[in-house]
Amino acid sequence: MIGLVGKKVGMTRIFTEDGVSIPVTVIEIEANRVTQVKGLENDGYTAIQVTTGAKKASRVTKPAAGHFAKAGVEAGRGLWEFRTAEGAEFTVGQSINVDIFADVKKVDVTGTSKGKGFAGTVKRWNFRTQDATHGNSLSHRVPGSIGQNQTPGKVFKGKKMAGQLGNERVTVQSLDVVRVDAERNLLLVKGAVPGATGSDLIVKPAVKA
């Protein structure tokens, strides 16, 4: 089953009939419009390309404008692709709505995490701090040794060090679907999802469900 592109509206909570409070993230999923259908013959795999939302005509590049015009679809705020099973029937210009999640119990949500700027190893990688006293001065939050000796004579790739924290693609798996509001194009999932309010999210049925 394909996924959909939505926008993070924010977090709130809803109550069950027993009065239990459930923290939920509200995701607005406007109709996803199919802009291209890819097939085995021409592309080597099967997929659909979709767009959602709207973008000012002055902000759409000429190649993108031609692509949208060819599909007969209003220019959206981006293009996303979802792989499809062979034999799945989709047509260019078709709209796919949030109600495809009506029978789905768990979803995977992908977004871009909030950027935190340059961060040290304690904040970024949960390193322990060094001694506050006992002869330690000026080295309380430094990482310590980052290598060995003349052999190997280098710092290994992937070594956990200070640097940019956040602002990367993150997927949270197996979030419970609490409610599907097809009238208002809303999907409520239990818990938090990556990214800032207003950021784009990709919602797919959970692979581990």
Curated annotation (Swiss-Prot):
GO cellular component annotations of the record? cytosolic large ribosomal subunit
Reported function: One of the primary rRNA binding proteins, it binds directly near the 3'-end of the 23S rRNA, where it nucleates assembly of the 50S subunit.
What's the PTM story here?
Answer: Methylated by PrmB.
UniProt entry keywords in alphabetical sequence: Methylation, Ribonucleoprotein, Ribosomal protein, RNA-binding, rRNA-binding
What's the protein here called?
Answer: Large ribosomal subunit protein uL3
- What organism does the record attribute this protein to? Erwinia tasmaniensis (strain DSM 17950 / CFBP 7177 / CIP 109463 / NCPPB 4357 / Et1/99)
**Alphabetized Gene3D superfamilies for the sequence:** 3.30.160.810, Translation factors
The UniProt entry's sequence similarity note says: Belongs to the universal ribosomal protein uL3 family.
Subunit arrangement? Part of the 50S ribosomal subunit. Forms a cluster with proteins L14 and L19.
| PROSITE patterns per the UniProt record, alphabetical | RIBOSOMAL_L3
* PTM-bearing positions, type N5-methylglutamine: 150
Q: Which GO terms describe its molecular function?
A: rRNA binding; structural constituent of ribosome
Provide the residue span(s) of the region labelled Disordered. Answer: 132-153
Tell me one Pfam family matched here: Ribosomal_L3
The keyword Ribosomal protein is annotated on this UniProt entry? yes
Give any single GO term for biological process. translation
Q: Out of the domains of life, which is the source?
A: Bacteria
